[in-house]
Every structure is written in C-alpha cells, then in structure tokens.
Curated annotation (Swiss-Prot):
Comp. bias regions, Polar residues: 556-566
Any single Gene Ontology cellular-component annotation: nucleolus
Composition skew (Acidic residues), residue ranges: 463-483, 526-545, 600-609
Annotated organism of origin: Pyricularia oryzae (strain 70-15 / ATCC MYA-4617 / FGSC 8958) (Rice blast fungus)
Assembly mode: Component of the nucleolar and nucleoplasmic pre-60S ribosomal particle.
Gene name as annotated: SPB1
Described function: Required for proper assembly of pre-ribosomal particles during the biogenesis of the 60S ribosomal subunit.
Protein name per the record: AdoMet-dependent rRNA methyltransferase SPB1
Biased composition (Basic and acidic residues): 386-396, 484-497, 610-627, 659-676
Principal location listed in the UniProt entry: nucleus
Binding site for S-adenosyl-L-methionine: G56, W58, D76, D92, D117
Length: 865
C-alpha cells in the first residue's frame, strides 16, 4: 500500500521544502533557528537537554550551533534515529526511570538549556486536549527545575487555552524573564506559541504545588455578585462582559412579586432580576391578587416593578419599604417583630436569672459581686490603656508630619518637670507658697473664698492674669518657631537657599536649630488641687519674714562659693594644675582695678551664657567657654606681669588695667586683608553706583551718613511676628538708583566670574600637573642613576636618557570606538555586548539609512546655495 501524505493547505510550504533541502528531519528545525536568532541562547550553552525530541530536528540544530565538545541529550517516547554528537534514548519524561537515565548521562553537570517541543495524542474533545498539553508542559517544567543550572534557559511549546495564564504565572515565579513569541515558521492556523524563560532563579526549595497540575490548573470559584452595589449605587456599576450564563442566553429574568415579598434576601433579587410581575393569569396564584389589591401597591410601585434595570437608588429604597409594609400587613416576620420577640425572651431569661441569684447564699452573692467589680476594673484599665496608646500614636504621627517639635513628646511624659509630674518644686520655691507651707497652719478654703479668688483674677488652678499673659507669650513664641520651620521646609528645595545656608554654616553665623521647649519654662506652671488659707496671726508673719528662706531643691554642685567674684566656669578653669604655682601669689593683695576687670569679665561671660540658653545651648556654651578661657588666660598673664614688675612693692599703683574692646573690633580684624584693608567685595549694582559716586566726588562720606537717616532706619520691629517681618522685608524697602555704567561693570564682573572653569576641571588640571611632576621626578632619579653608571659610555647614557624622555612624553593612543551591529545575538540587547571592551557603538540598518538620508539632504541644501 502506498504511503499517504498530508496534502492539506499550508502543509507543504517553503519551510517544508527548506527542511528537505538542508537535511533537517522536520520543518520544526526552523522554529528553533528563529528563536535562537532572536534570543541567542544556544551559542552560550555547553549542556543541552531536549525533551520530546523525536524525530530529532531540534537536536540537529543544537549540534550545529552549539560549541564543539558540547553535551546534548535527547529523549522521547518514540524512537529517535542516531544523530552525530547527540545522545538519545527512548523513555517517558513523566517517569522516574527517565529522570534516573538523564542523571546518568549528565553525571555532575547541569543543563544550560532545556528544550521542550512535545504534544500529547489528540483527537478527543478540544478542552481535554488543551489540558493534556498544559499538563505535559508542566511535567517538562518539573524535569527542567531539577537539571537546569542557575541562570539557565527553558524553551517550551504552549497551546493557548484557559490554562495558559496559570502556567505563565508559574514561569514568572521561577525565572527572571519570561517572553511568549511565535516564530514565522510556525503556522498561523496553529494555536501553538513558544515561551522562552531566561534566568532560572534556582530556589533551594520549590513548593510541590507549583508543579502539581491539580493545584496550578484548579478552577477558582466565581466571586459572589455584589448586589448591594447594584441596588444602592447603580450609577457606578460597571458591566463585566464575561459571556452568558449556562442555559441563560436571553439575559432576561422575570419573577412574581410574591417571591420578592417572601424572600429573605431581597437585595439579591433586585440586583439580578429584570422585572417583578404583578399580573395574574387565569386560575393563577391568589397571593398576586392580594398584592394587587393592597393600598400600599400604588401606581409608582407598579411602574418600578415593570423594569428594575433602569431604577435608581431612591426607587430601590421605595421597593424595599413597600416589601416591609406588605410583610407586616400579611403577618410575615419583620425586624421589629423579631426584635420584640428577642426582647421578650431576654426579659424572661433575666427574670429567671434574678430568681436564681436570689436563691444563692450570701457568700456566693459576695463572690459574684467581686467578680463583677474585677471585670469592671479590668475593662476600665483596658480602656485607659487603649486611650493612652491612641494618644501616643497621635503624637508620633504629628511629629512625623512636622506638626510639633520632637521635644513635645518628651515633655509630655511623666517626669520631674513634665505635665504628669506630682510636684513642681521650682514653682513652689519661686512663689510665696513655700513660706506658707513652712507654717503648717492651713485648712481647705470655702467655696465663697474660692469664688472671691476667681473674681480677683486667680483661677481654679491658681493661675493669675500675669500667668495667662505668659502663656500667650509662650504660644506666640511657639507659633513663630513653627513658622520658621515651615519656611525652612519650603525653601529647602531652592538651590540658592541651600548654598546660602551652607555659607552661613561655614562662617558660623547660621541660625541654630530650635531644640524644643525648655524644662525651666515648664516649671513655671502651677496646678494646685485645693485652695488654702492661713490662720496664723500677724505676729507670726513678722517672725517668719525675718527667718531665712528654706529651699526644696538641693543643688547637686556642693562646691563652696567664694567671694572672689569669679564665676563657676572661671573658678573651675583656675583650679587646673597649671595655675597651682600662682596660688601663693594670688593670696597677696591684688590691685582693685584688676579685680574689677576680672569680675566684669566674669559677669560678661555669665550674661553671654544666659543669652545663649535662650537661642542655642550647645553652640553658644562652646563659644562662651573659649572666650572665658582666653580672658582668664590674659588675666593670669597680667597678674604674672604685675608680679614680675612689682615683686617688692605691694601697693596698688604702678600700672593701669585697660579693658579689652568689643568683639566687633576682633571681627573687623579677621575680615581685613594682609595689607590692613577691609576685605569687601562689590557684588551689586547699587554698591557699584555708590562706589563710583564716592570715587568721583559726587558724594562724600557725610552724604552717605545722612542718607542712612530715613523712614526705613528707625522701624520698631520688636514684638512683631516673623511672617509679618518677612512680608515687610520683601515689599517695604528703599529703591536706590543705579547707573548704566555700574550695571555694565557688575555684568562684566559676573561674566568673568562665570567664565572660570568648574571645580572638576580645575581638579583635573591639578591632577594632571601633579602626575606630570611625579613623572618628571621619577625621570630625574633614573637619569641620575644612569649618569652615575660606570659601565656605560657617555653616548649610551645619552641614548638611554633620550629613550626615557621619549617614553615619558609619549601620549597614549586614543582607543577607537568599536562598532557592534545589532543583529543575531546582539539584537535588542541591553547593556554591554558580550566580549566587547572599551568604548563601543551599537548600529543597525535603520541607522545606516538615516545617516545616508541626512547626507543626501545636506548635499541638496549645498547645491541650492
């Protein structure tokens, strides 16, 4: 009998003929060739595993393209004729025997690429065939996960079906890149596509459900329809075109109205039904006749029941109310009736419980009450704990949103000076309360006296009008600080502003960061729980006034204070070992002017320390310490001078102590140049205009001083908020005239300033000069060695030195740009191509055509000229 060939349309196409010409066993060989041309995975593979390889065309392509001495293993259920450089055997890939045979051939190797082009026996129902194909692909995937190396490639054939997305999800979990493609040699009428999975993740453990067809291809249950959204929000309802329901191809549902009345889920009926029928057929149901005759069934209800799909929220509510009214009239259970029944049942149960409790003995009753009290107490504690946690959470959120200062949360916590503190000792000592407490004769004030105190300006918590004013001042200060923080955050995105702040930080004149509310400010708040009155006589008052005042706060610094006039910081400085030798001399009588100078300097240091606490504690304290140390050192030097000059004379005469000038003089000295002139740079057109006028004699220094006295010079800015001052600074400022020559000079100055090279360029030039100097130094050392070499003639020495000079001055050849054509393995590549070092440029035919077109256009434009 003659062999029958398939002569269907598209079977004997050009790929079939090319396969015959080139000696491939099947036209499927060109599918692998085209896939490799696009992704280039065969050239990089040393070990390849081909599953379902019969008749062997993919193994033939792999043997041709892969490097020499590569290991290629092919397996199929059908026999495969021998192929050069390929190991083939016959087995079922779903069995353990096949897995053991593959492991025997690969030994310790791992496969770089796993191919799968298999298909099961088909011919039954299409749904079953597609599932069998997906199951076979999953089995191949299971085999690939065992033998594939990390970063390997898996290429498989997949038939598009409802299980395709589930399989693609599994691929994405195990591989870094997953792409689905259809090569040109694949027939268009075929549902097959090829999935190329690259970059195997090689997890240490894989969940068996990933490779179990029952778990991967399990059908998910349909979600419960949201009928409430259809009823209460019909305007935002979106239609999902999922096809028709099984057996319902008209998509039209009609139900009798009495089913809607009797249903326990009326919303589901309203969301899924098109019409509620009130029409009664001959010999029909009596319930519909009753509904029709009820007074609640109005014409509007009949109209709404005619078409439910066009109703809105209001009409649906009307139908639900109509249903409740009808159910109540017909005697059906409603929410009200059910609630009444539950209340009655609860009352009966409570009565029975009361009867049972009364029968208990006394001990049981007491125990029951104790348990109730414990339960109530634990409930109360839980509630308080929850409120406290909520308050803390709100504080943290406020701090994260920059609504409060970070120190606010710390101040609010329980502590010696916080809100939850039991005693405010500083406040007690500060006021007149401590003197009254020392007497011990106090009683609780009456309500009438408390009312008098409130009328006189003292609140229930002992807070007077002055304290309320202090509270307002504190709130204003906090508001100004919050405004400063807001301005900082708003201007932080401006590059000029950041540069300005950096300059200020380098110069040391930047604003310090606000560190929150001080504890000393919180100590002024007094909260008394009861009002006290004194019962002592006037005589005792007089006696107590003369008594020394006692303090509740103990100073931890127990260092005895001396009457030398020195502050604590200065005294601690003079206690160092370097000044011990001066102790004997210091006991001698010192000049009164010198003592006054030292005392004045210490007072200045203390005053600076007090001011520094209001602004910024840390930075100012360091500055004050340095200044105090300098002044103390100068005072010690002066004292030593006095001792040297007048060692025999103990009188107060002989020299005059002159106090040092202001700090501004020192600052001016820092700003002066080496030749004594002030370091001033003119950077604005107004300053340049004034400089021209002073230089040309148009203005004198007295004129400049007179111009300084204007309406802007004596503005009272004390007490004004910061936001108001910012607005005034922007808009209310004097407009000084400028000349054209001054503007041109500033412009030329800025042009020269901008023409300077950037910092990177200057650094590069500096590095270049430094390297050249280093090479020259090495060259000098080598030339000195050659000159001192005795075994060489003068000519040889000169030639060697000239050779060194040529080698040192020789420039490195510029590396040429390598051109890489974007085709084959380099098509669509991202990053550096493999095997390319140095500079490169990727080109393609499209770019070549565009370059030719540009040259052609340029030549045409040149001819027109």
């Amino acid at each position: 009998m003659a062999i029958q060939k398939k002569h269907g349309k598209g079977r004997l196409d050009k790929w079939y003929k090319l396969a015959k010409e080139k000696g491939y066993r099947a036209r499927a060989a060109f599918k692998l060739i085209q896939l490799n041309k696009k992704y280039g995975f065969l050239e990089k593979s040393k070990v390849l595993l081909d599953l379902c390889a019969a008749p062997g065309s993919w193994c033939q392509v792999a043997a041709e393209v892969m490097p020499v001495s590569s290991l290629i293993v092919g397996v199929d259920l059908a026999p495969i004729k021998p192929i050069p450089k390929v190991i083939t055997f016959q087995s079922d890939i779903t069995t353990e025997k096949c897995r053991a045979t593959i492991r025997q051939h690969l030994k310790t190797w791992k496969a770089d690429t796993v191919l799968h082009d298999g298909a099961p026996n088909v011919g039954t129902a299409w749904v079953q065939d597609s599932f069998n194909q997906a199951e076979l692909t999953l089995q191949a995937m299971k085999l690939a996960t065992e033998f594939l190396v990390e970063g390997g490639t898996f290429v498989t054939k997949v038939f598009r079906s409802k299980d395709y997305n589930s399989m693609l999800w599994v691929f994405n979990q195990l591989f870094k890149k997953v792409e689905a493609t259809k090569p040109p040699s694949s027939r268009n009428v075929s549902a097959e596509i090829f999935v190329v999975c690259r970059g195997f993740k090689a997890p240490k453990r894989i969940d068996p459900k990933f490779l179990d067809p029952r778990a991967v291809f399990a059908e998910l249950a349909d979600p419960t329809p949201n009928n409430e959204a259809k009823v209460y929000k019909p305007e935002i309802k979106k239609r999902k075109r999922d096809g028709y329901e099984e057996g319902d191809y008209t998509q039209y549902k009609e139900l009798p109205a009495y089913e809607f009345i009797q249903s326990t889920d009326p919303i589901a009926i309203l969301g899924s039904t098109n019409r509620l029928s009130l029409e009664q057929s001959k010999n029909g149901d009596v319930a519909l006749a009753v509904l029709e005759k009820l007074p609640e069934t109005t014409d509007e209800i009949r109209t709404c029941c005619a078409d439910l799909k066009v109703l809105g929220r209001k009409e649906f509510k009307l139908l639900l109310k109509w249903r409740l009214a009808v159910r109540e009239k017909l005697g059906f259970p409603t929410k009200k009736s059910v609630k009444k029944e539950e209340e009655a049942a609860a009352a009966v149960a409570a009565a029975e419980e009361v009867a049972k409790i009364e029968s208990m003995d006394e001990e049981m009753r007491i125990q029951h009450e104790l348990e109730k009290l414990k339960e109530r107490n634990s409930t109360k504690k839980k509630r308080e704990r929850r409120k406290e946690n909520e308050r803390k959470q709100k504080d943290i959120v406020r701090m994260q949103m920059h609504m409060v200062a970070p120190m606010d949360i710390g101040v609010e916590q329980a502590g010696p000076e916080g809100e939850d503190a039991m005693f405010a000792l500083r406040a007690v000592e500060k006021g007149d309360v401590m003197r009254r407490l020392a007497k011990g004769k106090m009683v609780v004030a009456s309500e009438a006296d408390a009312k008098k105190d409130r009328d006189s300006g003292i609140g229930s918590s002992g807070e007077t009008d002055d304290e309320s004013d202090e509270e307002l001042d504190r709130l204003e200060t906090e508001l100004d600080d919050m405004y400063d923080q807001f301005r900082e955050r708003k201007a932080a995105s401006d590059a000029k502003y950041r540069a300005k702040k950096a300059r200020q930080a380098r110069n040391g004149d930047g604003d310090e960061e606000w560190e929150g509310v001080s504890d000393n400010e919180k100590a002024d708040e007094i909260s008394d729980d009861s009002e006290l009155e004194e019962e002592s006589s006037g005589d005792s008052d007089d006696e107590d006034d003369t008594a020394p005042r006692k303090s509740l706060l103990t100073d931890l610094d127990t260092t005895p204070s001396d009457n030398s006039g020195l502050s604590k910081r200065a005294r601690a400085f003079f206690n160092q070992d370097i000044f011990k030798e001066l102790d004997g001399d210091m006991d001698e009588p010192m000049d009164e002017e010198l003592r006054a100078a030292l005392a004045g300097e210490d007072e200045d240091a203390d005053m600076e320390d007090t001011v520094s606490k209001a602004d910024s504690k840390k930075t100012k304290e360091k500055t004050a310490d340095k200044k105090a140390a300098k002044k103390a050192k100068k005072a010690a030097q002066k004292a030593q001078q006095v001792k040297d000059d007048d060692s025999d004379d103990e009188s107060d005469g002989g020299f005059e102590v002159v106090k040092s000038g202001k700090e501004d003089d020192w600052e001016d000295e820092d700003k002066r140049t080496k030749d004594g002139r002030l370091d001033i740079d003119i950077i604005t057109a107004e300053a340049m205009t004034l400089a021209h006028q002073l230089a040309t004699g148009q203005k004198s220094s007295h004129d400049v001083i007179d111009d300084g006295f204007n309406k802007h010079a004596f503005k009272d800015r004390e007490g004004l908020p910061e936001w108001f001052l910012d607005d005034e600074t922007k808009h209310d400022k004097p407009q000084k005239p400028i000349t054209k020559a001054a503007a041109a000079a500033i412009k030329e100055k800025m042009r020269a300033f901008n023409a300077r090279p950037i910092k990177k360029v200057r650094e590069a030039k500096g590095r270049k000069k430094m390297k050249a100097a280093q090479r020259l130094e090495k060259l000098k050392k080598k030339s000195d060695l050659l000159v001192n070499e005795e075994g060489m003639t003068e000519k040889e020495k000169a030639e060697s030195i000239a050779k060194l000079l040529r080698k040192a001055t020789k420039k490195k050849p510029k590396q040429a740009v390598k051109v890489v054509v974007a085709k084959g393995a380099n098509r669509g590549i991202k990053g550096r191509p493999q095997g390319i070092k140095g500079r490169y440029k990727i080109v393609d035919p499209r770019m070549k055509k565009e370059m030719r077109a540009l040259k052609r256009v340029a030549q045409k434009a040149k001819k027109r000229r």
